[in-house]
Swiss-Prot record:
EC number(s) given by UniProt: 7.6.2.5
Gene name, Swiss-Prot/TrEMBL: ccmA
Lineage of the species this protein comes from: Bacteria, Pseudomonadati, Pseudomonadota, Gammaproteobacteria, Lysobacterales
Native organism: Xanthomonas axonopodis pv. citri (strain 306)
Protein family: Belongs to the ABC transporter superfamily. CcmA exporter (TC 3.A.1.107) family.
Keyword ATP-binding among record annotations: yes
UniProt-recorded name of the protein: Cytochrome c biogenesis ATP-binding export protein CcmA
Cited SMART domains: AAA
Length: 214
């Protein structure tokens, strides 16, 4: 008798997920999933709820309808942070600390990826030589790169990336795609919102298109 194949559950799954603000629908209901090694590119016009969706998944907003599962198990709002690393529009950095101090501080709060160190993460994102530079002295693009270094150090298997290509030049855009691809090869997954022309999807990418609520 041939034993049935046991497939792993999705790293993230959402069922009947919807969000409203002031009784006005923002998105949903949505059903989608993301497997390990896969990216989901979330597209839609301004106002379609892309940022709101990622903030709901990250637990930054309370959702009144639907279910979110991690590895096949229901995940409450407060339990999802260790599984997810969120990169939003604001870098969330300490302006009066150096780049290296920021990374050490954040690693102390959230841990870090095995075999990765803050100094090497700065080199990966093109900030070698800026270890002692204060964040408030950095350009917008350099701050984005520092936020990407923090993302790279995160041990979380699921990345939630809200417009990660913003404030980056072509080299920076290539860097983001390389990082996402490496994360997927390591068994991670990513949700990426974008409407940019340079958002070349990494391997194993599916699309989720949000429509502006009528």
């Amino acid at each position: 008798m041939i034993e049935p194949l046991h497939t792993a559950p999705p790293l993230l799954a959402a069922h009947d997920l919807a969000f409203s603000r002031n009784e006005e629908p923002v998105f949903g209901p949505l059903d989608f999933h993301v497997d390990a090694g896969e990216a989901l590119l979330v597209q839609g016009d301004n106002g379609a709820g892309k940022t709101t969706l990622l903030r709901v998944l990250a637990g930054l907003l309370h959702v009144e309808r639907g279910q979110i599962q991690i590895d096949g198990k229901s995940a409450k709002r407060g339990d999802r942070s260790r599984f997810m690393a969120y990169l939003g529009h604001l870098p969330g950095l300490k302006a009066d600390l150096s780049t290296l101090e920021n990374l050490h501080f954040l690693c102390g709060l959230h841990g870090r990826r095995a075999k990765q160190m803050p100094g090497s993460a700065l080199a990966i994102v093109g900030l070698a030589g800026y270890e002692d530079a204060l964040v408030r002295q950095l350009s917008a693009g350099q701050r984005k790169r520092l936020a990407l270094a923090r993302l790279w150090l995160s041990p979380a298997p699921l990345w939630l990336l809200d417009e990660p290509y913003a404030n980056l030049d072509l080299d920076g855009i290539t860097l983001v795609n390389r990082m996402i691809s490496a994360h997927l090869r390591g068994g991670g997954a990513a949700l990426v919102t974008t409407h940019g022309a340079y958002a070349a999807p990494p391997v194993r990418t599916r699309m989720l298109t949000l429509e502006v609520a009528a």
